[in-house]
C-alpha cells in the first residue's frame, strides 16, 4: 500500500536513513500519519509536541476538536512509542500565551477579528520549532499541513494542497523563504480520505479521531475568554447608524465583529449589519448590506514569497473559506503596506483577517487587513 503514497525525497543530497526529520506532532491524524509514513520510509524521525496550554489543569484540555494539550499530547506520545521513534514534549505555555492568546485578546479589543491559528504558525510552530530543529541537528521540520512545497532550479514555492477542501495555504501565508528551506509538507499531495486510509493501514490508535476545528484555547466562546483576560474591555456603549443616530446599547465591543447581523439587540425596518467598530468612542456602527460592500483594501505587515509587480493581477482570499476574488496589487505610501483593488465589490471585509494572494496554485504572499 505504501507504493500509493510516494513522496518526493525530503533532501536531494541525502538518502532517507541519513536524513533526520523533526515532526511537529499535534496528536491528530495528519501529523501522526506524516511521522509514521516517514519512519516507514526509513527516515530518522523525531516527534516533537508542544504543550501550549493546560499544564495547570484549568484550561481546555478535555475539549473535543482542539490540539496540543491533555489527550492530544498523550495520543502523540502513544503513536511515537507504538511506532518506535523518539518523542519529546516541550512546554511552550508562556510563549503561546504571550504570542497568541494575548495577541488574540488585544486584537478583539481593538475592534478587529483575529486569526490565532496564523499567529501560532507564524511564531510558536514555525519560528520556535525551526530553532528546535536546528538545536537537534535535524535536516528538516515536518508538519501535517495540506500545502505543497515545490522546488525548481533552487527556487522554492509554497502552493495549495491537492485536496482543495483541506487546503491550509491561507493559514501559512506568513511563512518566510528562509523557513521554507527547512520545512516539508509530505501530505500536501494527498487527499484527506486517503490519509485516513493510511492511518488505518498503520493501525494508529487515532485513525478515527476527528479533525481539530475550534480555536484551541477558547473553552466556551471568545468573548468570555477575552473577559477573563481583559475584564476592563467589557464596557457598555452605544450602537449607532452610519449617520451617528443612536439605535441602542451594546454590552462590549468584543462581542461584535464586522459583518455581524444576529445578536445586535435592536429592531429596525431593514436588516442591519455591523459596518465598523469605533474603539475610540466605544461604539458599534451598523448599516444596511450595501454599506459593507468594498473593493479597495489596505493591507499591512506584508510577507512576499514572490515580490509582486505594481498592478500585478492575482487571486486573493479574504478569509479561510473564501474561494477567491480577482484583484490587483499596488504599493502604498506607508512602509510594508499595499493596496489590494478587487475587480468586484466584496461583502464584509474584516480588519484583522488575512489577505492572501495567489498566482494560480502558488502563494505569492499576503498581509493583515487594516481597512
From Swiss-Prot:
It comes from the Bacteria. Residues 166-168 are annotated as: Interaction with tRNA. It comes from Wolbachia sp. subsp. Brugia malayi (strain TRS). The record marks 145, 353 as: Interaction with tRNA. One of its GO terms (biological process) is tRNA wobble position uridine thiolation. SUPFAM superfamilies: Adenine nucleotide alpha hydrolases-like (SSF52402). Belongs to the MnmA/TRMU family. The active site is at 120 (nucleophile), 216 (cysteine persulfide intermediate). ATP binds at residues 24-31, 50, 144. This is tRNA-specific 2-thiouridylase MnmA. The keyword Acetylation does not apply. It is found in: Cytoplasm. GO terms for molecular function: ATP binding; tRNA binding; tRNA-uridine 2-sulfurtransferase activity. Its EC number is 2.8.1.13. InterPro entries: MnmA-like (IPR004506), MnmA-like_C (IPR046885), MnmA-like_central (IPR046884), MnmA-like_central_sf (IPR023382), Rossmann-like_a/b/a_fold (IPR014729). Keywords: ATP-binding, Cytoplasm, Disulfide bond, Nucleotide-binding, RNA-binding, Transferase, tRNA processing, tRNA-binding. Catalyzes the 2-thiolation of uridine at the wobble position (U34) of tRNA, leading to the formation of s(2)U34. GO terms for cellular component: cytoplasm. It holds the Pfam family tRNA_Me_trans_C. The keyword tRNA processing applies. Disulfide bonds join 120-216.
Amino acid at each position: 500500500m505504501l507504493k500509493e503514497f510516494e513522496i518526493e525525497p525530503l533532501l536531494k543530497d541525502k538518502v532517507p536513513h541519513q536524513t533526520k526529520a523533526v515532526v511537529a506532532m499535534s496528536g491528530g491524524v495528519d501529523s501522526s500519519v506524516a511521522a509514521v509514513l516517514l519512519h516507514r520510509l526509513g527516515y530518522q524521525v523525531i516527534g516533537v509536541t508542544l504543550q501550549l496550554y493546560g499544564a495547570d489543569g484549568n484550561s481546555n484540555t478535555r475539549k473535543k476538536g482542539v490540539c496540543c494539550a491533555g489527550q492530544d499530547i498523550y495520543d502523540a506520545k502513544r503513536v511515537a512509542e507504538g511506532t518506535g521513534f523518539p518523542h519529546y514534549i516541550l512546554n511552550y505555555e508562556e510563549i503561546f500565551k504571550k504570542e497568541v492568546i494575548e495577541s488574540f485578546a488585544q486584537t478583539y479589543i481593538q475592534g478587529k477579528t483575529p486569526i490565532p491559528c496564523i499567529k501560532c504558525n507564524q511564531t510558536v510552530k514555525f519560528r520556535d520549532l525551526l530553532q528546535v530543529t536546528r538545536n537537534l541537528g535535524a535536516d528538516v521540520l515536518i508538519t501535517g499541513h495540506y500545502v505543497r512545497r515545490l522546488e525548481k532550479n533552487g527556487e522554492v514555492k509554497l502552493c495549495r494542497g491537492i485536496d482543495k477542501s483541506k487546503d491550509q495555504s491561507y493559514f501559512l501565508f506568513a511563512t518566510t523563504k528562509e523557513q521554507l528551506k527547512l520545512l516539508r509538507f509530505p501530505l500536501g499531495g494527498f487527499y484527506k480520505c486517503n490519509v485516513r486510509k493510511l492511518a488505518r493501514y498503520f493501525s494508529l490508535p487515532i485513525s478515527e479521531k476527528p479533525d481539530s476545528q475550534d480555536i484551541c484555547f477558547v473553552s466556551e466562546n471568545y468573548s468570555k475568554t477575552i473577559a477573563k483576560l481583559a475584564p476592563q474591555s467589557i464596557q457598555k456603549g452605544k450602537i449607532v447608524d452610519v449617520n451617528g443616530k443612536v439605535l441602542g446599547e451594546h454590552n462590549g465591543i468584543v462581542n461584535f465583529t464586522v459583518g455581524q447581523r444576529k445578536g445586535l439587540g435592536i429592531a429596525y425596518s431593514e436588516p442591519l449589519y455591523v459596518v465598523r467598530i469605533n474603539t475610540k468612542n466605544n461604539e458599534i456602527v451598523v448599516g444596511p448590506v450595501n454599506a459593507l460592500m468594498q473593493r479597495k483594501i489596505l493591507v499591512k505587515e506584508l510577507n512576499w514569497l514572490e515580490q509582486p509587480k505594481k498592478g500585478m493581477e492575482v487571486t486573493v482570499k479574504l478569509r479561510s473559506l473564501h474561494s477567491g476574488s480577482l484583484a490587483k496589487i499596488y504599493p502604498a505610501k506607508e512602509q510594508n503596506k499595499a493596496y489590494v483593488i478587487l475587480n468586484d465589490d466584496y461583502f464584509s471585509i474584516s480588519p484583522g483577517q488575512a489577505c492572501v494572494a495567489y498566482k494560480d496554485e502558488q502563494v505569492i504572499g499576503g498581509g493583515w487587513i487594516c481597512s
